[in-house]
Each structure stands twice: as structure tokens, then as C-alpha cells.
Amino acid sequence: MKTQTIQNTTNGNTAPATIATASDTAPPTTAPKKPKTVTVPELIIDGGSSRTKYYLEKITGSYQSICRKFTKAQELPTGYLGVFKIGDSGYAVGDSALSLSGGDIEEGYANDNKIKLLNVWIVGSLCTHPSFLFKRIKKAGKGNGVIKIDLKIALLSLSSHRKKEIEKAFSNLKFEFDERLFEINVVSYNLYPEGYGAACAAKKHIKESGGKDIRFHVLDLGGGTLTHTPYSNQNGVPRASNQNSVSGAGVVSITEFFAKEASKGDTGGNIYHFSRLKDALESSSVSESGEYSAEIVLGDSTRDLGDRLKSGLEAWSREIIGVRELLRDVRQILRKGERVYLTGGGFKVEAVRAFITNYLGSELVATLPNPDTINITGLD
């Protein structure tokens, strides 16, 4: 402690004497703690007719857009990813829906289910995430209380104009998972046109490459739909206009044309199951000389159906009128010098990517990185 000493002397002057001042005895002050900033997690969800894709807490996931609905009387396994209850009804989505029996099956592409079952696809995304709900169960500890979660949602959908129906799905997100009750409070949401995340990634690519493009285009091949969207590359963010979609022209239809071609002629008594042909398509390749390869396992042997796959792709692009006209439109656009970016799970398949790129025949065509997930990660 600092002191000052004052005392009398014989000559009338004063000498220092020890005293304490208030400032010396006051306790040290500390700066007030800043309140912790609470970050509300954001679920980016792309509810496709074939697969539902999501991005949450830096993890990308997807599951087949299929759900199995169970009555109150039917018991469900506990702790399985993608298995949950909403009200008195049980649900299983994706692989869990395919592995369980009983109940009623609903698929994303049927009966307007992308919107009608939007609450199921949202909860299904949370319940298939490998850690999101489990971390909150651990933090909540033991007990029967409702675990409340604030959440932001970004939804990519061709049905983004149906705002009231979408808001209805957000209004009551209460469910049970792993024997715990959850309640989701959607604090905010944004609706984006399908393919918008890919458009953001395309705009970034143009900027990084020093391009001055006023317009660019995104060609999105998903499980159920082929979509072409032109974008304006001005005023900060990409702006879509005149979106053209061919419903029923996605990878599922390509697989169907492949199956039709594979079954022609003498198959040697082999039966090509749709799921095996789908696997052969997904693992297909194209050599530098342009030879297609699509191997399918038949018992102890393997057969290459590459020539049948190429024939199937040709039939798909020729016999579906919407596909034929859309691809012709894109070829005309390329002649004007405007870039076209390929995205969607279909362009993850090498044979499909090679076929369409070769058909379009232009150096202005580029495939975005990770085309199966860029549409959601591009929004982050």
C-alpha cells in the first residue's frame, strides 16, 4: 500500500507521517463480463423428390425421400437414426423406412408430399444427423422435460411461392426421439429457389476467375427433376428468372431407360434388379476414348453394361420431349457466350456428366465441385 508520512518537527515544519487514502484501500475493479453471444444453429434443407439433403453444424447429410408412417399401437425401435414420433404417429425416414416393416409408405415425389410432409422431412433431417440431437440430450441430462431448441431454417424448393403452406409446417415442430421430447422454435426462415446455393457458388467462381459475365446459367439434374435456371450476375447476389423444370426427368428416369436397354435381347437368363442397375449407374465411368463402363455383379461374375447405359442416356435425351427441348435451349444459350454450370446429384455420376457435357459441346460448360451437395453448402 502506498503511504505518506506527516509529523511535527522542532523547527515548525512538518515531516511525513503514515496515512492511508481511500484509493489505496479500495478493492481492485474488474471489467464487466460481456454476455455470451448465443449462436442459433441454421438448418439448410433441400427437400428433393428423390433425396432430402441437409446441412447443419458443418455436417452435410442426406436420406432417401421416403417415410413410413406407423399407428400408435405399433412399437418402434429406440435410438435408430431417422426414427421418431410426431403426436401419436410414428415415423421412419430414409434407410430406416426401408428396413422396417408395416405402416404406410409415402414417397417425396408422390401426391405433393414435398410440401404436405415438409414437417416430417425437417424432423427427419434432425433425427438422421449424427450428433445434433444427441449433444442436446447429453446437455439436458436425465429427466423427462421437453428439450427446447431454437433453430433457423433455409429451405430450397421449387414450391417457395407456397409460403403459407410452408409456414404451417414450421408452426408445430414437436416430436419424440430416443425417448426424449423435443420442441423446435423456428426463430427465422428463408426460402430460396431450387439451385440457389449452386448459383452462389457459380457467382463466386466467376469472380475468382476474373470474369465479367452479366448472366450465367445453372443446369440442375436431381433425382426427379432436370432444371435450367438463368441468373443475373449483377447487384451483389444472383437473381433467378424464367426457371424451366422438367419433372420426372431426373436420375430415376435415367435409371429406368438404362433398365429398359439392359433388358433388351438375350440376357443369358439374368434378371437385372433395379437397385443393382442403380448401383451400376452410380459407379459408371467413361474412358478417354469415350467408352462407357457400367459393371453389374451377377452371382460370381461381373457384366459390363456400358453400351446399354449409353443407349439408355441417348433414349432419355431423345424420348422425353422436355429434356430434348431443354438441352437444345441450353446449347443455343452457349452459342451466345454465356456460361453454364452443372450441379445436382446426377452430375456426380461420371457417365451422366460426360454424356451431357459432350452433348452440349462447349468449353463454357463447367461442373461445380461436389455437385450433389453444393446446392446446400453454397448457402453457408
What spans do the regions from the language model cover?
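Nucleotide/phosphate-binding catalytic cleft detector across ATP-hydrolyzing
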Residues: M1-H217, N235-V251, Y292-R339, F347-D380
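A structural feature that tracks compact, well-ordered secondary-structure segments
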Residues: T227-Y231
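An amphipathic alpha-helix signature
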Residues: V252-A259
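A mobile "lid/hinge" subdomain adjacent to the ATP/sugar-phosphate binding pocket shared
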Residues: K260-G312
